[in-house]
């Protein structure tokens, strides 16, 4: 691609534009040669890998067509041709007449160079910029030469003035002041210093008068404008951009081009500089260039000339738009807020805001958009100050709201405890009613049995009476016959001829009222139970509504053996802990029918998701708080030193005398002695050894004043009657309410949670679904089970589908949503399980027993001392303790019942193990629901994308047609690129400068695009040509 080779082969003669050679097609070469030539064509295109890979899939015919198309575009001139031409324009030895003749074609040569830089392949551009040709240096030198007379034109100087030459030399030397050495990295700084020294030598050798006249001739043409276009084309490559950014004079010369009289050139320069500002590291380089501009042009303030041009060029809208866009970007593309305010203030001092107020009503819509974009980005410092004050007010308001929320949280906690207490009370009443109902049922059964027995006896009595009535006439007849016979025979003869038993039969019968039937004999004992079944046929609980199968009798309960389930695929094993058949009776699992659930589930989907890939210590008891420190001292004076020191500290905290303390202990006065002090004082109960020493000291009648204050206190302290019991009683009195308030919510939580878990019908149905799916998975390997341990619920997340994207719990949540939507909020029936999970029931029961012992201690003390404080305490709190003890018994019974109901043992399963199972299950179930919803939304998005892609590819249904469509599209795109003058943007960072300029023309810059993530290039100093 590039300029066509002309017939003369002389650079600069014909216009350098891409033209097609005659369309005669050459015969196709051998395949090896064809591949070599095709590879060269691909490398010259600089295509991205995906499109190059697609071109390599062409057949030989299409490859040859592409080679022929590309070879019709031949590079007209090599890079050194243009470089030699530009160097000839800079030759100081050329006469003025000869220079006039040469300079006529300078603009034309520059235009051809710009087209070549824009349209030729990357190899041509690299050759132009390499160390041998140094095309960038030549371009920058020519640009500097083309505008060296501009300074004199602005100062109104004519050639021949010695002061002008001094100013010229000063201008050339000022190029050294690019920016402070610390502003750029070491490679930039070293290159800058070395090149700046060379630049000073170059400018100092320029013949002043002749060079000034030649420069004036060049400045009257479009050479500066085209030079900027050449530099823009070079910077559009990542490789060229890095070279321009690291060049010590290039950006400075571009900025100095703003002094050109052509508004179109100024607009081009500002567009390019604005694009560089948006490149990471570019903003600092642009500011350094304007610092250099200030020194060269003798500005009092930076950007002074720029604002002057902005105000004066009001007739050229394109320049004003470009200028406003550059000011917006150079001010607001930095991240540091303080620096943005500083740059903003620079332009404010130069009168930008006043000018914008005048220009806001301009007829140009583009200029209005740029002005509004700048105003939208402006930092209003006053507004920021108001915002800061508003923030402080808001923070104070937040503190008030947080305090209010804290109060509301406390109130909510109190309401929750009240609610839990009410629920627990209702549950206790329900349990009591259930007990009463069981008692009534038992009484009813006994009464029914007695009534049945009485009815049977009455019926038997009636039957016997009827038989007797029926037999009485016969008996009377027989009696009359017998009487007659006896009368004839005589009693003596009769008795001699009959046995005794027959004589009894002839005895007169008793009257009917005295005949009562005997009760039936007792029922025979039940037969012994048969021996247990072998392990291969485990018994099962009865399944209501299931098909009839083998029923085995074990004791008094019958269980039905579950038939194995045949699955289409092998399924993973669900490693649950199954309950034994003899553990099922009386549990929740005896009420479940998992076989009925299987009829409702989508088992085909379940098997497809979960088929295997390969197909073919007991708690420590808390001792009582009221321990006494029994440290035996073998050898002591009166009190051991450390013990006396600690006692003194404790007594100072109380601020009471020893007499006041002992008097308060006598009267159980907790107003004088707070309970905290009593508990501290209990650590200093006198030991037996200390009491002996104190008594001996007293018997010796030694003066008490010689004792230390601690010893005197201990002497009085030890004389208190029943000191240990009194101290323990005071501690109990002081802590009773706190203990009551602490234990009651825990017992209520256990009662409420136990009752709600046991009575939850939705939880039972959830377990039924889990049991059904688990049996379905395990039936072919382990056989069906009748129940499982609750810890098995944690394994639902470990059983994953074939693609590892879904767990068994996710499938259960999906099934519940589709088949059983009423169960979706099953956790609403489980009340206070989280609170119950934090309760140690064993410790709570021990604390209740401890309170009972403490209350018994108070009763004994009250019976001994008859103290009003103790009497009032007993009358007030005995009922509360009784209620607490009843609640403790109810909580224990309710918990034991619910644990046994789920097939667990209360001895091995405390509440801290039982209830957290449900807490974890609920939390995991909710997360599974959320993940299912997220997966559903993602699938819908993917489905919409797929439908959109299918709609676009209606004409490409088969793979061959799709490849053919892609190839045709790529060929058309390549031909469009060849016909255009703009260099195509392929991949990487190439083409970014053009992209930035294009975007900025369509969308005004806002401060949000200045964030680090929106930078277009990485730091240019850290890129070498391998990154291009």
Curated annotation (Swiss-Prot):
BP-aspect Gene Ontology terms: actin cytoskeleton organization; angiogenesis; cell migration; cortical actin cytoskeleton organization; cytoskeleton organization; filopodium assembly; regulation of cell shape
Tissue: Expressed in endothelial cells.
Modified residue annotations for Phosphoserine: 174, 1014
Residue segments, region Disordered: 493-541
Membrane-spanning parts: none
Main localization of the protein described in the UniProt heading: cytoplasm
Entry text on domains: The DAD domain regulates activation via by an autoinhibitory interaction with the GBD/FH3 domain. This autoinhibition is released upon competitive binding of an activated GTPase. The release of DAD allows the FH2 domain to then nucleate and elongate nonbranched actin filaments.
The protein, known as: Formin-like protein 3
Gene: FMNL3
